Amino acid sequence: MDKLVIEGGYPLSGEVVVSGAKNAALPILCASLLSAEPVHLENVPDLQDVRTMLKLLGQMGVQIESGDGRVSLNASKVDNLVAPYEMVKTMRASILVLGPLVARFGHARVSLPGGCAIGARPVDQHIKGLQAMGAEITIEHGFIEARAKRLKGARIVTDMITVTGTENLLMAAVLAEGETVIENAAREPEVGDLAHLLVAMGAKIEGIGTDRLVIQGVDKLHGAKHTVIPDRIEAGTFLCAVAAAGGDVTLRKVRPLILEAVTEKLREAGVTVEEGDDWMRVRMDKRPSAVTFRTSEYPAFPTDMQAQFMALNTIATGTSQVVETIFENRFMHVQELNRLGANITIDGNTALVTGVEQLSGAKVMATDLRASASLVIAALRADGETLIDRIYHLDRGYDRMETKLTALGAKVRRVSGSQA
């Protein structure tokens, strides 16, 4: 099992190109199931989760060609409507095949999902919405089985804002008979990116980017070409890395407008951030100021940046509160940050972070995707060497992170378990 070894204390400088968004690429790959014609994608990140999704789609009969950030998918010969436990357990986003399969083929059998162990994240909103559209759904032996001759348009009000739920129901609705209205829809840019691809495939969707999506169902979708949006969480992670380690870095292929909640807090911490249409420059030459924040749905501060910003707060002047409102059990990185010398206490869904002048390198363990990123950020600032175990979590969501950091001047190397 690979590990990362990071020697702290080196400021970052140079340029980094932000990869395509994982959380946009995964539903967009699933959307290829909605058409018998080819879908051509660009700016697809090379991540473990993407490879897992492509493997799942391939097992279903989708013909796939991929390389150099491009993926072409042809779902004209799909012959397997099952997403097995072996695939789904490693990646929760596998649930996103449910809506497209039921909408186009009238049947799907999908194992209950896994992924990061950060809370229950139930799929009941997906099921409730599909049932409102006329699907018959049973759950037994660990599988969700859904059947429908043709889905019918419906008004769906989700009990909570759910990103994957919105995406699944949106993909189901585009081939349903009549009008579907999704109220309380997630407004995340990745949902909007999926919607733009669906429109390019012939779907009729109004309200993209709002919490009310109105879909007029069509009989079939055609092929399309689409470029995946930049990954705002990868961009935010690099911004926090520079803020912690110090330095002067320019990010390319980024959308500053979808990062405003993060950049606002970085400026509050004393970081200098400049931005253009598709670039950002971040500079830091001092110890950051502690920043209190709470996570919430887009456009508020993203839960996927909570751990990285907490790592920044560990070496800040002052004390900060971090309130996590989206997921329970998303403070698993706290124990590992404290091993590096951080001073963090937890009370329910709130973490109290008292900044320290210096962290010290130690052996730590990644517990989930964003937690692993927080440990990398802390290690860049720590005195001495930090060894991060279980970095397969990092590989699920970051495209060549150690390569990009090394190019910026960080001392990072990947070692196999036998070398560590």
Swiss-Prot record:
Residues with the 2-(S-cysteinyl)pyruvic acid O-phosphothioketal modification: 116
Protein name per UniProt: UDP-N-acetylglucosamine 1-carboxyvinyltransferase
Lineage: Bacteria, Pseudomonadati, Pseudomonadota, Betaproteobacteria, Burkholderiales
Subcellular location: Cytoplasm
Pathway where it operates: Cell wall biogenesis; peptidoglycan biosynthesis
Domain of life, source organism: Bacteria
Keyword Cytoplasm: yes
Residues that hold UDP-N-acetyl-alpha-D-glucosamine according to the record: 92, 121-125, 304, 326
Annotated source species: Paraburkholderia phytofirmans (strain DSM 17436 / LMG 22146 / PsJN)
